[in-house]
């Protein structure tokens, strides 16, 4: 059996495809595959993400990749789960969740191993994520937050050139690329990650042969935790453009979920933490609590 795998052409995306195929071949060593790279709207966009979101261009990094699956040009699309909207095309589904890599955000600074609280006043910190921007402003209103675009290598080069004093990235991306950089992991209680961060997923056509195949090897723990986190996002509203963080952990047979929503300025912040049995149930309860306590309106900004 041979399958065609669609993904973005970035170094990180192709590394994620490599991780997916390695995982797949553990179960199906005779499987053959072909990788199809797709140039996406998000890759080609030059405008700030907030502006793109206002135009309704959500799902910037997955739309054309999934289109290849819908059109039959590929059997599977490989994504970082945090880039996927909570609502997929009804003809598609997430068939497999890989074991989770570290879900946390990290701070990389020019001056050394600084935590966010160690940065000097007025330091310029780079990110284009609404969640990260709001969290930085909440924790350190004396810092300057500046948009940061490009792939991981480009972002690190901009840091080295002195355009920023520090940048915030997903630890999973840094780890997957095997980058030799010093960083400080940000406390998830203060700096909660994007829902689903650290998880690679495979999207397929519903009811397809490959969908059934992948479901048989999906990581149960990853799927459970991702479902809890993404249910908060879905029920609260706003997709991957809302300033919302969530992280879930297994505690025996239960799930502990912490979720945070912030105003764009970071001045208003609501944190909730709940324990429940079912991932959807605990996610829905967390979203309801956030809605009840939320005194502000949220805004847009990419999670890439």
From Swiss-Prot:
Reaction equations catalysed: 4 porphobilinogen + H2O = hydroxymethylbilane + 4 NH4(+)
Similarity-based family: Belongs to the HMBS family.
Metabolic or biological pathway, per its Swiss-Prot or TrEMBL entry: Porphyrin-containing compound metabolism; protoporphyrin-IX biosynthesis; coproporphyrinogen-III from 5-aminolevulinate: step 2/4
Transcription is among the record's keywords: no
Modified residues (S-(dipyrrolylmethanemethyl)cysteine): 240
Role according to the record: Tetrapolymerization of the monopyrrole PBG into the hydroxymethylbilane pre-uroporphyrinogen in several discrete steps.
Stored PROSITE patterns: PORPHOBILINOGEN_DEAM
Protein name: Probable porphobilinogen deaminase
InterPro entries per record: HemC, Porphobilin_deaminase_cofac_BS, Porphobilin_deaminase_N, Porphobilinogen_deaminase_C, Porphobilinogen_deaminase_C_sf
Statement: the UniProt record of this protein carries the keyword Transferase: yes
One Pfam family linked to the record: Porphobil_deam
Cellular component, GO, one term: cytoplasm
Species this chain originates from: Ignicoccus hospitalis (strain KIN4/I / DSM 18386 / JCM 14125)
EC number in record: 2.5.1.61
Superkingdom assignment: Archaea
Co-factor remark: Binds 1 dipyrromethane group covalently.
Entry keyword set: Porphyrin biosynthesis, Transferase
GO biological process: protoporphyrinogen IX biosynthetic process
